[in-house]
């Protein structure tokens, strides 16, 4: 078991009822996390009898997992605002309130995206000065990973929102991923400054003026897989389309490679020889190893995983929360916003 010398415990509230494979995969993800690290306590939120039945399958340090009863579940098809307002005993609302009341350092869920986005703003609340909280997943590239921000939270963003996304994304990549002076680019249809729609044209000069980020200009969609930027800024509609295309294409390519390798006896022999290198390459492009997408700019950490998240993504999302807390990402975002506000007032 990995030991933390300071033994400062990170408490992660985990939605045991959210996602396509709940409660089995969230529970297994929690167990794997606490079996790997002693500096984590997972608060499993859900229908207690169901959660405990899953826990009975595993051996784990009992003091590191606590079951919090939540009778209700918010389904994906439910209108998010109504669900958050009416289902006070749902796993999502209970988890969000634990973060708000400082009973947990973070909340992780594979549940309803809409409910998580609404709950994050309504219950946890925004850091003072943050106009909109963006959803920011990591996507694999040939050079490592890039942060795609925003990917689903703000489909009607303004230029000032995108500037804040760039700053928050830069802080996240530098402190969580350890990338010094991360390259920030705005997603565009060409490299020239005059290219793009009205939002991009308005945002570009504002980003150029920012002295606290390393703005490198525009990035085209075809350049994303090559890792030409560490932080890719866009509004949520475009970001979500890029993310879903990225994920779908990755799955298609893996399937095509497997099919081709098994098509003939010669290809099967070649596949056996190439298998170690192929596994290593495919692992590098497996987004689940990086955890979920944080909703940045809130008064507490909220992480949204894929609805289809298996245990490994849940576990890595929990580890992600530990790093977020240790690096005081919210404190750094708050400090940056205060500094920016003071400069604007000069």
Question: Where is each model-derived feature located?
Answer:
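Short, glycine-rich nucleotide/cofactor-binding loops
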Residues: 12-24, 153-163, 304-311
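N-terminal phosphate-binding or glycine-rich loops at protein starts, especially the Walker A/P-loop
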Residues: 2-52
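Glycine-rich phosphate/diphosphate-binding loop of Rossmann-like nucleotide-binding domains
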Residues: 24-25, 37, 41-43, 48-52, ...
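Short beta-strand segments
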Residues: 15, 44-46, 68, 109-111, ...
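Glycine-rich phosphate/nucleotide-binding loop
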Residues: 121-134, 138-148, 228-232, 236-346
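Phosphate/nucleotide-donor binding subsite
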Residues: 60-104
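Short glycine/serine/threonine-rich phosphate/pyrophosphate-binding segments
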Residues: 22-26, 89-102, 106-120, 127, ...
């Amino acid at each position: 078991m990995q030991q933390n010398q300071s033994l400062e415990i990170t408490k992660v509230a985990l939605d045991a009822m959210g996602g396509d494979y709940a409660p089995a995969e969230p529970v297994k993800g929690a167990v794997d996390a606490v079996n790997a690290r002693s500096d984590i306590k997972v608060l499993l939120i859900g229908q207690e009898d169901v959660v405990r039945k899953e826990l009975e399958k595993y051996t784990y340090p009992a003091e590191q997992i606590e079951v919090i009863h939540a009778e209700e579940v918010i389904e994906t098809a439910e209108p998010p605002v109504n669900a958050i307002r009416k289902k006070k005993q749902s796993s999502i609302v209970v988890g969000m309130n634990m973060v708000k009341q400082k009973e947990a350092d973070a909340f992780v869920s594979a549940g309803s995206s809409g409910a998580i986005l609404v709950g994050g703003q309504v219950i946890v609340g925004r850091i003072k000065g943050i106009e909109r909280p963006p959803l920011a997943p990591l996507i694999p590239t040939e050079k490592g990973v890039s942060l795609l921000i925003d990917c689903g939270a703000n489909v009607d963003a303004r230029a000032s929102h995108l500037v804040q996304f760039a700053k928050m994304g830069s802080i996240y990549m530098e402190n969580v991923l350890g990338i010094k002076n991360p390259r920030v680019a705005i997603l565009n249809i060409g490299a020239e400054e005059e290219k793009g729609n009205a939002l991009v044209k308005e945002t570009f000069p504002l980003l150029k003026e920012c002295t606290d980020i390393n703005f490198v200009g525009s990035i085209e969609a075809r350049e994303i897989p090559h890792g030409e930027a560490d932080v890719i800024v866009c509004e949520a509609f475009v970001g979500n389309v890029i993310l879903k295309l990225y994920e779908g294409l990755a799955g298609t390519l893996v399937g095509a490679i497997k099919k081709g390798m098994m098509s003939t006896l010669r290809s099967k022999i070649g596949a056996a020889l190439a298998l170690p290198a192929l596994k290593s390459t495919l692992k590098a492009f497996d987004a689940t190893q990086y955890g979920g997408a944080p909703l940045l700019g809130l008064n507490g950490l909220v992480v949204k995983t894929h609805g289809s998240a298996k245990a490994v993504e849940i576990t890595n999302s929990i580890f992600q929360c530990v790093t977020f807390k240790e690096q005081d990402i919210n404190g750094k975002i708050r400090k940056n916003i205060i500094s920016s506000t003071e400069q604007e007032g000069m």
